């Protein structure tokens, strides 16, 4: 696809954990990148980057963002402030879709959603055919945006990605357990150790977003992104694997509760949630020929090596 027309891409959320890897990969592949940002950012060292300073709800700015673009990556989202989630995740997506409908050059649109849209589930394996029942505001707004994308009638290839728990060296997330190894974290390991971690490195999410740009998608496709086919992608499995990189090679001897116990604890406090034994299937990804460039072990090794350098 990138060989047949001008390499101009547009991206929202370019400063986020996934967006910045997409920008890096596009630049490395020789693309010109136009990004939307609420604040002026210094990209003076990247002549192929242009910044459009505006909010996601600014219709004129979005049309400027998309002008001449062949590929669009929508990564912008509000993850923390519930009072802004509808405005950003739903209304912002609606504005972007309106801009896409009047932009004739776009051939590929990638929407970054979340595996969390599946909501509470007891299913052992979750795939793209499972029904979604989002339970919190973030999940609901991301799923509503998904449905808007699916029903917008876009005349282009559309890919919806649902990453699990995204991490990298700057935002290690669950990997903080073996990094800090405090009493508090050991208690968490005891309680949640046998639950799925659903980790996915941001670099592998970006790789998937660019991979499907080069596939001929006959219809809108949805993909879960998680290393869950690797049996070590549990809270305790990640802890053991990360600790195994140390030259000290100290044995990791600990006991973790069955995954049903933390589920019951969450249910008593917050109601139904995703059961800790759930795994997100990689079967559909593989059927399209995509293999994670990093995978679980290599992605954790990246974090480990970066922390070693810092220390």
Language-model segments: which ranges?
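NAD(P)H-binding glycine-rich loop region in Rossmannoid oxidoreductase-like domains
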Residues: 41, 45, 53-91, 95, ...
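Glycine/proline-rich active-site loop of Rossmann-fold NAD(P)-dependent oxidoreductases
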Residues: 143, 167-177, 212-224
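Amphipathic terminal alpha-helices
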Residues: 8, 286-287, 294-311
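Conserved Rossmann-fold NAD(P)-dependent oxidoreductase catalytic core, especially the SDR/UDP-sugar
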Residues: 91, 95-137, 159
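NAD(P)-dependent short-chain dehydrogenase/reductase
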Residues: 154-160, 164-197, 202, 242
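N-terminal Rossmann NAD(P)H-binding glycine-rich loop of SDR-like oxidoreductase domains
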Residues: 9-29
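Mid/C-terminal beta-alpha module of Rossmann-like enzyme folds, strongest
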Residues: 208-269, 304, 310-311
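Catalytic helix-loop patch of NAD(P)-dependent Rossmann-fold dehydrogenases
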Residues: 122-161, 165-166, 188-190
């Amino acid at each position: 696809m990138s060989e047949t027309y001008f390499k101009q891409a547009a991206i929202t959320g370019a400063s986020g954990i996934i967006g910045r890897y997409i920008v890096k990969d596009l630049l490395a592949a020789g693309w010109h990148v136009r990004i939307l940002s609420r604040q002026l950012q210094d990209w003076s060292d990247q002549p192929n980057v242009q910044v459009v300073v505006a909010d996601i709800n600014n219709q004129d700015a979005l049309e400027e963002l998309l002008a001449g673009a062949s590929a669009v990556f929508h990564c912008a989202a509000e993850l923390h402030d519930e009072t802004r989630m509808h405005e950003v995740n739903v209304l912002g997506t609606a504005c972007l879709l309106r801009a896409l409908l009047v932009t004739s050059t776009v051939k590929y649109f990638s929407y970054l959603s979340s595996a969390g849209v599946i909501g509470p589930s007891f299913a052992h394996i979750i795939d793209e055919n499972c029904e979604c029942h989002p339970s919190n505001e973030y999940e609901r707004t991301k799923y509503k945006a998904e449905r808007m994308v699916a029903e917008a009638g876009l005349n282009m290839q559309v890919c919806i990605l649902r990453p699990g728990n995204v991490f990298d060296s700057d935002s290690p997330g669950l990997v903080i357990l073996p990094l800090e190894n405090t009493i508090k974290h050991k208690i968490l390991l005891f309680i949640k150790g046998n639950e799925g971690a659903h980790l996915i490195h941001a670099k592998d999410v970006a790789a998937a977003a660019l991979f499907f740009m080069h596939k001929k998608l006959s219809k809108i496709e949805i993909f879960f992104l998680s290393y869950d086919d690797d049996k070590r992608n549990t809270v305790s499995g990640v802890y053991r694997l990360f600790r195994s990189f140390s030259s000290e090679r100290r044995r990791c001897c600990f006991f973790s509760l069955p995954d049903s116990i933390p589920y019951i604890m969450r249910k008593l406090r917050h109601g139904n949630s995703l059961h800790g034994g759930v795994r997100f299937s990689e079967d559909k990804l593989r059927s399209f020929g995509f293999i994670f460039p990093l995978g679980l072990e290599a992605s954790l090794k990246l974090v480990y090596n970066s922390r070693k350098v810092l220390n």
